[in-house]
């Protein structure tokens, strides 16, 4: 049995990690959470490389998890210019179901949310503005857009409903 691939993309402060944490809480051991920022900054100590090594690691970890019947959450900013091809390949190679979500949150809201996080001391809202990419959507696979008005609970419920829907 193969797991389901869940891709959560969006700008810093858009709520990706909060969604991943809640999905993992609800789904328990069925989920492998692959966090792009952790692999990029901590494991590989990369800045924004044109062909990041962490992208290959994300692809390999997700493929391994899915092949062993686990659901894989691939979560991160993952700009299309650096990660789009890897995400397209990952989705195309997966024989099971693929669910991609883009959190389309305005910069002002991401900056406000950032000010409430523990990691707000690690970088400023001004730095976030440099990274912000408006509607950086994948050409393929198609992403479901999650808008600012969707609460954490509503977004998680929507994803859980998508996961339980019969293909």
List the predicted regions and their residue ranges.
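Hydrophobic anchor at the beta1->P-loop junction of P-loop NTPases
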Residues: 8
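Conserved phosphate-donor/acceptor-positioning beta-strand/loop module used by diverse small-molecule
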Residues: 94-113
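P-loop (Walker A) phosphate-binding loop of NTP-binding proteins
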Residues: 11
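Conserved substrate/cofactor phosphate-moiety recognition/catalytic segment
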Residues: 21-67
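Small-molecule kinase domains that catalyze NTP-dependent phosphoryl transfer to phosphate-bearing small molecules
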Residues: 116-160, 166
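Glycine-rich phosphate-binding loop used to anchor ATP phosphates in small-molecule kinases
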Residues: 53-95
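ATP-binding Walker
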Residues: 14
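Walker A/P-loop
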Residues: 17
């Amino acid at each position: 049995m193969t797991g389901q691939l869940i891709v959560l993309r969006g700008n810093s402060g858009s709520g990706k990690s909060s969604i991943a944490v809640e999905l993992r809480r609800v789904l328990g051991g069925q989920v492998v959470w692959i966090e792009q920022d952790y692999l990029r900054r901590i494991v590989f100590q990369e800045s924004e490389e044109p062909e990041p090594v962490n992208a290959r690691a994300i692809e390999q970890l997700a493929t391994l998890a899915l092949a062993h019947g686990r659901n894989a959450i691939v979560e991160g900013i993952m700009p299309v210019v650096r990660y789009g091809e890897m995400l397209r390949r990952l989705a195309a190679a997966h024989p099971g179901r693929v669910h991609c979500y883009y959190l389309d949150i305005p910069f002002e809201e991401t900056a406000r949310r950032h000010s409430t996080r523990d990691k707000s001391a690690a970088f400023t809202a001004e730095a976030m503005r440099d990274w912000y990419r408006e509607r950086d959507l994948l050409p393929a696979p198609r992403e479901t857009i999650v808008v600012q008005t969707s609460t954490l609970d509503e977004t998680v419920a929507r994803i859980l409903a998508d996961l339980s829907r019969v293909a």
